[in-house]
């Protein structure tokens, strides 16, 4: 745990980490069950500003806004994971595209090789764009 500055009593307080589920349930007290922010913060033993931030984030996420912080609603968590997966796949795709470019910057094209009815072999791949069709 990361230690934060001392509180009024001189005791060093540790930074608490809360799960997305805890944050969501705490904010739902205000949004869904009509607690005041102060009452919900007191009931869940968190700071007033923390509870205010969670409530705002829950409302924003329910309106479809992408959170800047870690998402707390299941839908936004899934969206974040899908975006990460898409980004990873796009990066892998870019790597594969770059791998098909040979040392002189020419693409080794499967379409060109098969376009003249030839077979994909080493001669066709390294022909450097020369037509091997007879």
Curated annotation (Swiss-Prot):
Keyword DNA-binding set for record: yes
GO terms, molecular function: DNA binding; transposase activity
Keyword DNA-binding assigned: yes
One of the GO biological process terms: DNA transposition
Pfam families: HTH_Tnp_1
InterPro entries per record: Homeodomain-like_sf, RD_transcriptional_regulator, Transposase_8
Keywords: DNA recombination, DNA-binding, Transposable element, Transposition
Family: Belongs to the transposase 8 family.
Function: Involved in the transposition of the insertion sequence IS911.
Name of the protein described by the UniProt record: Putative transposase InsN for insertion sequence element IS911A
Species annotation: Escherichia coli (strain K12)
Taxonomy of the source species: Bacteria, Pseudomonadati, Pseudomonadota, Gammaproteobacteria, Enterobacterales
Name of the gene this protein is made from: insN1
């Amino acid at each position: 745990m990361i230690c934060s500055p001392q509180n009024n009593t001189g005791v060093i307080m540790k930074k608490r980490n809360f799960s997305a589920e805890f944050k969501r349930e705490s904010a739902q007290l205000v949004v869904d069950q009509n607690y005041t922010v102060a009452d919900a913060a007191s009931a869940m033993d968190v700071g007033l500003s923390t509870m205010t931030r969670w409530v705002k984030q829950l409302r924003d996420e329910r309106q479809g806004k992408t959170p800047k912080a870690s998402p707390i609603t299941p839908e936004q968590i899934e969206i974040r994971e899908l975006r990460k997966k898409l980004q990873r796949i796009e990066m892998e795709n870019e790597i594969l595209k770059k791998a098909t470019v040979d040392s002189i910057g020419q693409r080794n094209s499967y379409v060109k090789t098969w376009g003249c009815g030839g077979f994909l072999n080493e001669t066709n791949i390294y022909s450097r764009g020369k037509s091997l069709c007879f």
